[in-house]
Amino acid sequence: MSNNEVMKLEEDKELKGEFKELCKALRNNHRINPNLYVEYDVKRGLRDSAGKGVLTGLTEVSDVTGYNLINGRNIPAEGRLYYQGINVNDIVDSLKDRKFGFEETVYLLMFGHLPNKTELEHFLDVMFELQELSGRFVRDVVMKASNENIMNAMQRCVLTLYSYDENPDDISPENVLRQALELIAKLPLIAVYSYHSYRHFRKDEMLFIRNPEKGLSLAENILLMLRPKGEYTELEAKVLDIALVLHAEHGGGNNSTFTTHVVTSSGTDTYSSVAASIGSLKGPRHGGANLKVQNMFDDIKAHVKNWGNEEEVGAYLHKILNKEAFDHSGLIYGMGHAVYTLSDPREVILKRFAKALAEEKGRMKEFALYELVESLAGKMIKEQRNLQKNVCANVDFYSGFVYSMLGIPQELFTPIFAIARMPGWSAHRLEELTNANKIIRPAYKYVGHHTEFETMEERSAEKITDEDVKEELEKCKKEEKGKK
């Protein structure tokens, strides 16, 4: 190691020490007494004490329901999800007679009704034309500064597209619609190409860039562009299409869509709004949860010998809940939802397709483990936390398993979610621009103390605290005793 490298290491150590000291001061300064949140009835996470979301807006884009209102009381019910008033179960059931439904779902969310044959054909033609990324953009933006976290790469690319737009700041409905459709069309290419760039430049693997093909669904094109030989089975494409449909939209209150509303209300451009929503979705408490589920199951498989033994699996789940195993968070990922109580309709549907795919891939033993954990975890969480509300599996529970069976790398788990959710964000952005004329600005109460400004000389002077006085008094007492 050279002298310069040794000096750099020493400087880094010194800097880390400085940050450690600064963080001590930061923690002491920023810690708020938790009792104050109760005293001032703060709706933490914009939820009431029962976990129900505070009403902050209205929407016609989708409806998320986990209760039935009976005699003025909310009674837990099987979960229901509606896109523009149409039950998502009906959308999925309609795909038995047709191959793919994501593009039709995009049209429904954006324009409020299902397209007829002519409308759909025209829409598909438009979306294919909008897909194109120039060779210059791919070379100068996507391929530069490759990143292990594809969500960050997507944010960077989306923000850079602002510079390629001749009219980026116009927030008229016509212009925002154009921008939204372009981003819906381009985001899959950005995600897949960013992943290939990462593999090539960070892992020294072969680089291949394949263009999407006209006449294929988005699900088919993702698999085509992602795989070295571009091959896939009909069931693989079908299951990915279903996953995209189920992730396309989920109300205005989820974190990334609420981010869309908040940022849009400021009057900013579409690219900034979408980049902010991608940043929100990246978080492990939101879109990143599917990867957490996958990692948790890898841990369970490594520590439980008999995956079919209910007692052994249950014992390990208890360890996870007691913060004795996995990431020591005490969380069983993929379980529980802010709205759904008895079931998450997306999870119910995806589970059905996960089973079909597991049969094709010879991974039924793993599927059985997922089913067993699902059957045990909800009751265990409810019992341990003494909850009144039921705890059901959510869509993240099976989505990571599905993606792994499709050969989708973990780096693309959350980007696939972002690709799917882009039409939902777009519909909500247009709804916010059309109906709202106020910037979203909730209240925060100051609970600190007011103090006098001190000059530099006063700040530099040695401060005598109450603790210092106590210590000095104790010292004096000891000295007096010694004299006696």
Task: Give the predicted meaning of each segment.
Residues 2-484:
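Non-transmembrane, aqueous-exposed alpha-helical and coiled segments at domain scale
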